[in-house]
């Protein structure tokens, strides 16, 4: 009989990840640069990983993305220096994630874009994903917290106190830090709301029990 494993009591580690690419999908196009910042819920940074990648053989930039990169000369220059081949980088990245002292959770804004790229590259060049199939989308979290329509759940519409004074430069490491701090602030608000609701529920139960108690007997 198989021995039952003890529950994993390690904390969740939020791996905020930003991808810079030259097109909408991997394969026909290439991931140019990516970065991850591993954070605890209180914004403690446990480590970072970043790399600039050589383009895929036979791939080419999408015309729309190529035109956009021409408007971002500093970010383009930053992601085209010290290039490494994906075959070397992705196994190293997966091992870095697996070495974190907790349960890694991939987070991004929007996760649908960044996780598509990272999952494809991890499976293609490392053969596994330390995140499984799952990613946490910060945009969806904002949609749930604000009650705004999903397509209007954009960073600019979020409350000012969710934003730390960090730059968003389209340089992967900068953007991973910025969105990671945003997520942690949103998570803190979620936890505060949960605590308040729990306190309200407890008060409601106490009031209900008090109202249903029989009246004290009167002396003869």
Task: Label each residue range with its predicted role.
Residues 92-95, 99, 116, 120, ...:
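Residue-level signal for well-ordered alpha-helical scaffold segments within enzymatic catalytic domains
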Residues 125-129, 148-156, 190:
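Substrate-binding/catalytic groove segments of enzymes
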Residues 18-20, 114, 137, 175:
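Acidic active-site catalytic centers that drive phospho-/nucleotidyl reactions
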Residues 105-111, 116-117, 154-220:
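Acidic, Mg2+-coordinating catalytic module of metal-dependent nucleases/exonucleases
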Residues 55-58, 66-70, 136-177:
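Active-site-proximal helix-loop-helix substrate-binding element of RNase H-like nuclease domains
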Residues 97, 112-133:
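Substrate-recognition/cap helix-loop segment adjacent to the acidic, metal-dependent catalytic center
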Residues 3-15, 20-109:
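Conserved non-catalytic scaffold segment of RNase H-like nuclease domains
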Residues 31-35, 122-126, 190:
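Glycine-rich, phosphate-binding/catalytic loops in enzymes
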